[in-house]
Amino acid sequence: MWGIHHARLHTTLKIQQWLPLGSRILIALSGGQDSVCLTRLLLDLQPHWQWFLAAVHCDHRWRADSTANANFVRQLAQKWHLPCEVVCAPDLPKTEAAARSWRYQVFESMAKALDCTHVVTAHTQSDRAESLLLHLLRGTSPDGLATLLPSRSLGAIQLVRPLLGMTRAETAAFCQAYGLPIWQDETNHNVAYRRNRLRLELIPYLQQHFNPNLEEVLGQTAELLASDRAYFEAEVERLAPTVIREHPPALDRLRLRELPLALQRRLIQRFLRQHLKRGLNFRVIEAVRALITAGNGSQTASLPGGKHLRVCGRWIELVRPMPPPPAPVPPGQGGRSPPPSPLY
């Protein structure tokens, strides 16, 4: 098979070098139209790139038809002479986030077992647009809107999303044009899930009343934000040693004053991520940023975990919570030493 989408992907891979010649590639194959489209494209391009290709299917055991879905994937892979592993979740994931975390653990471990250098997933431009909208409605930073990067590290493996230039409508048309069998996941039509409601109700409304090319423009926006994110991440890594003191933890506020607002916020965020387990948000970052020009001795309100930051000369220092005072000694026990610790 060879068509316009083969040519487009072939050209993109030559330019971007996401999947170099001779790479060992593990395909995340759910059996849906997007992953079937991706698998067929890679199999058709394989002679030109001399890849090793294998597939993995993750069975979350959420649906009554999950075993039938897994068997469908096995049969399709066998028909296409594609090595395929089906992995069942040992426990039912409680949330979509937990399921996603488990899937990516499977991708990484299976790739290592097969000596694969790359894992590919079939996320499309439509997925990217949906993710951007979801994050925007929930509230996030510009970096949070730079969703579904085309390529990123997954431990020692490289995760690649080759279909970000195709919409879901295009993958459906591809499967139909080439007569490819696909598995219909009925849960994709359940609007109890936020992403499904956005996909089935909000995006069609926005396309009809605001912009018929919504998925394309949102995908382009995510791509522009991703390039900005890559630049700022590199700048933060370059500047961090000049701004962040590790021991004891502190920020150099004189150095921060010299930097643009965007870098101030990102460096503060980087510092706080090292020391806060939870609760990092815009208000916390702005409270710390206010200390850049505050008077000596100024401090933030208590941060998550009971910590706070305080101005001490040129430094904004992290102050850990004081340990609780010792319990009062009961009457009649004053001066009595505690029993010695047991020896092991």
Segment roles from a protein language model:
Residues 4-34, 54, 89-91, 102, ...:
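AMP-forming adenylation/ATP pyrophosphatase catalytic core
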Residues 172-223, 227, 313-314, 320:
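Mid-to-C-terminal catalytic subdomains of enzymes
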Residues 1-201:
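Core alpha/beta nucleotide-donor-binding catalytic domains of modification enzymes
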Residues 46, 114, 210, 272-276:
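A broad structural signal for alpha-helix termini and local helix breaks/kinks
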